[in-house]
């Protein structure tokens, strides 16, 4: 039985979307048990599952504008913090929240804790591509600054994830750089390139450019947290902006445009589904002693369900335990 | 009279697109004179203008896969190098090429030369936004590594450009960062934020995120070359990929989808025009003693025409001379 702690109070649609996602997941997966942290009365309004589920009541919660580190230190009874605490005390195997990202990162680092040997856990998401074949990218912004050694570790972390959770036998690992030639980049990239080239446990395919990552250039894309965050946001901003512009072009285009859009509806929907990656689950703060996963703040019940499914897969495949072994200093060849 | 040196042999559609663009520009602007560098016989195939134009024949040219610095050192008679040389010798006021970007940057730095006081010229483009109001961004990758002082200079450079060439009275200058709060970012960003906050000659509006830059967050976006390059490529990859996916959804969607697309044609075209920024001209290696401007490698005659128009505006407004004054150490307050 996998025990998953869920922060019922985090995100724009909490607790309804969270609890409904939990209902769905409990109905489908018989090998999971859910602990819901939050306002008991409010949770009960939506909870239909009655097996393998418990509520841990608390009035306290972390708000989206709370200062992350301060919040997890001061609000010891917040739903998110109690969930992380349960993982620390081995009462739960993993924790999920759709709340304040920074606070969840802080709870992950300071409450759940790093795997021994992992210097700086990275935030990793499975991102969509135009080819229909998603890719994992990290660090997406857990760190503002990274060293080449961190990037080296991200390559190993991402490769483990793609292999275990996404079932890719030999994930192609690429280093995000400003050109594909091996001599490209700043000193950080040059140093990281050397380290990745020598790393026998991964399939390093060299540098990849931000223009190509959404067209299947690699299965795992390694970036420092600053650049990874900027690229993620550039992709989001461009994608959302394009869709919004298309929509307003249709809405302001009169009857002809509306009829055209109606005829194209199925195709646009199919396109949207290709680009929708909520089925891949949430963003993992990877390199911690247990899965700590962030659902998007605007998650609906489906997205919560998929994140639970993702966490279950992480627990099933024991990807974290494998990482603990891989990073154990005793195992190091050097 | 503004004398503009044009590399007739650079880019995918050279020399035809280049020469046709020159024909258009010469017909419209009576105050410019063009020097075309390249294969005289081939140029003459397309040249219809016969006033204020001259051809400087050379057999040599820089290829797209030539190693930039080596190429400009070894191929002294290459069309691009001769154009830059003409600027150095004051025989021309500016140089334009659609050829090898790295080689043009090298020719700019080593042949034309930096403005005294500008440490690292930056590559700057006027980029489209969903609001229809474009923005200037630099450095887009002339440098793999930058210091806070370089970013400080980019803010001044970009502001001068937006003011003079784009006619924005008080350009809003934003620092590309991983959050909008002033405490965000790595040490480079924090240091740059301090410098920009104290810079009286610009209208610094604080940090901007990559998600918002295409929605009108700032008129000038300041980035280090590595991040700027990655964000530019992420925007390009997402934009092109979305359009390609939309196209193939329509093409494979049968008669219904094709009819829908037909009805939407005008609207999609309008949208494409909003996002098309070739009318803003090429990418300027800004901070040099004269305008050195890169047209996109795939430029058609229209894009070449617009780049000549842009360079003419730069010469008309004397933006480079103003920069020379602004960066003159004698003028510094400190």
Curated annotation (Swiss-Prot), chains A, B:
Its EC number is 2.3.1.274. Gene3D superfamilies: Isopropylmalate Dehydrogenase. Keywords: Cytoplasm, Lipid biosynthesis, Lipid metabolism, Phospholipid biosynthesis, Phospholipid metabolism, Transferase. InterPro entries: FA_synthesis, Phospholipid_synth_PlsX-like. It is found in: Cytoplasm. It comes from the Bacteria. GO terms for molecular function: phosphate:acyl-[acyl carrier protein] acyltransferase activity. It catalyses: a fatty acyl-[ACP] + phosphate = an acyl phosphate + holo-[ACP]. One of its GO terms (cellular component) is cytoplasm. GO terms for biological process: fatty acid biosynthetic process; phospholipid biosynthetic process. Pfam families: FA_synthesis. SUPFAM superfamilies: Isocitrate/Isopropylmalate dehydrogenase-like. Pathway: Lipid metabolism; phospholipid metabolism. Belongs to the PlsX family. Catalyzes the reversible formation of acyl-phosphate (acyl-PO(4)) from acyl-[acyl-carrier-protein] (acyl-ACP). This enzyme utilizes acyl-ACP as fatty acyl donor, but not acyl-CoA. NCBIfam families: plsX. Homodimer. Probably interacts with PlsY. This is Phosphate acyltransferase. It comes from Streptococcus thermophilus (strain ATCC BAA-491 / LMD-9). The lineage of its organism: Bacteria, Bacillati, Bacillota, Bacilli, Lactobacillales.
């Amino acid at each position: 039985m996998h025990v998953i702690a869920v922060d019922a109070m985090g995100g724009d649609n909490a607790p309804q979307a969270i609890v409904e996602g939990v209902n769905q997941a409990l109905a489908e997966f018989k090998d999971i048990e859910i602990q819901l942290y939050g306002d008991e009365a409010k949770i009960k309004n939506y909870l239909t599952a009655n097996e393998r589920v418990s509520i841990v009541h608390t009035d306290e919660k972390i708000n989206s504008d709370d200062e992350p580190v301060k919040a997890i230190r001061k609000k010891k009874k917040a739903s998110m913090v109690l969930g992380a605490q349960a993982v620390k005390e081995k009462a739960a195997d993993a924790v999920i929240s759709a709340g304040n990202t920074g606070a969840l990162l802080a709870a992950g680092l300071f409450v759940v804790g790093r795997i021994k040997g992992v210097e700086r856990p990275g935030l990793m998401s499975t991102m969509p591509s135009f080819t229909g074949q998603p890719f994992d990218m990290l660090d997406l912004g857990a760190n503002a600054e990274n060293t080449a050694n961190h990037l080296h570790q991200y390559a190993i972390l991402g490769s483990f994830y793609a292999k275990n959770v996404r079932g890719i036998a030999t994930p192609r690992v690429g280093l995000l750089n400003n050109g594909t030639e091996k001599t490209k980049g700043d000193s950080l990239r040059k140093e990281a390139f050397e380290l990745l080239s020598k790393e026998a446990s991964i399939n390093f395919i060299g540098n990849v450019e931000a223009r190509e990552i959404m067209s299947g250039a690699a299965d795992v894309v390694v970036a420092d947290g600053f650049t990874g965050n900027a690229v993620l946001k550039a992709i989001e901003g461009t994608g959302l902006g394009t869709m919004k512009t298309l929509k307003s072009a249709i809405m302001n285009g009169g009857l002809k445009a509306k009829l055209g859009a109606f005829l194209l509806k199925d195709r646009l929907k199919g396109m949207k589904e290709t680009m929708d990656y909520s089925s891949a689950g949430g963003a993992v703060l990877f390199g911690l002693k247990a899965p700590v996963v962030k659902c998007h703040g605007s998650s609906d019940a489906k997205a919560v369900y998929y994140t639970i499914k993702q966490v279950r897969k992480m627990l099933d495949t024991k990807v974290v335990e494998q990482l603990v072994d891989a990073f154990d200093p005793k195992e190091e060849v050097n």
